[in-house]
Amino acid sequence: MNIRQSGKYYEYKTLEILEKNGFKALRIPVSGTGKQALPDLIATKNNTIYPIEVKSTSKDVVTVRNFQIEKLFKFCEIFNFCECHPLVTVYYKKYKIVIVYELSQDVRTKEKIKFKYGINS
């Protein structure tokens, strides 16, 4: 498998972008396994924690399942003593653009969420 085809590549690209923008960030290499509420990445800036799910697509849309969204909110519940904002970053490969979506509580009730280029952005 080509490294650009793997999620790991886009996780590292997101880390680079975050660090260039003054965030402290790290990758959680076991995020997709087990039942723990671990995001792909954790970033901090200005006393706020950002659990991040990283996605990439060669299409105009990407679907994120509820359990992936829910783990971001559960992570925030662990850190309820500070600001915590769950994010999803989507790499739209054909447009060569990254869009960051901040999640609101109402998405927790949905079975899956579709992020569509040009609609949610």
UniProtKB/Swiss-Prot annotation:
An annotated Gene Ontology molecular function: endonuclease activity
Named cofactor requirement(s): Mg(2+)
Enzyme class: hydrolase
GO biological process: DNA recombination; DNA repair
Binding site for Mg(2+) 2: E11, D40
Entry keyword annotation includes Protein transport: no
Annotated residues for binding of Mg(2+) 1: D40, E53
EC number: 3.1.21.10
Site (Transition state stabilizer): K55
Protein name: Crossover junction endodeoxyribonuclease
Subunit annotation: Homodimer.
InterPro entries for this protein: Hjc, Hjc_arc, Restrct_endonuc-II-like, tRNA_endonuc-like_dom_sf
Record organism: Sulfolobus islandicus rod-shaped virus 1
Keywords (A to Z) from UniProt: DNA damage, DNA recombination, DNA repair, DNA-binding, Endonuclease, Hydrolase, Magnesium, Metal-binding, Nuclease
Keyword match Cytoplasm: no
Job of this protein: A structure-specific endonuclease that binds and cleaves the four-way Holliday junctions in DNA created during repair and rearrangement by the ubiquitous process of homologous recombination. Introduces paired nicks in opposing strands; on immobile junction cleaves 2 bases 3' of the junction point, on mobile strands the cleavage site varies. Cleaves Y and loop-out structures with much lower efficiency. Binds 4-way junction DNA but not sequence-identical linear dsDNA.
Catalytic activity of the protein: Endonucleolytic cleavage at a junction such as a reciprocal single-stranded crossover between two homologous DNA duplexes (Holliday junction)
Family, as annotated: Belongs to the Holliday junction resolvase Hjc family. Hje subfamily.
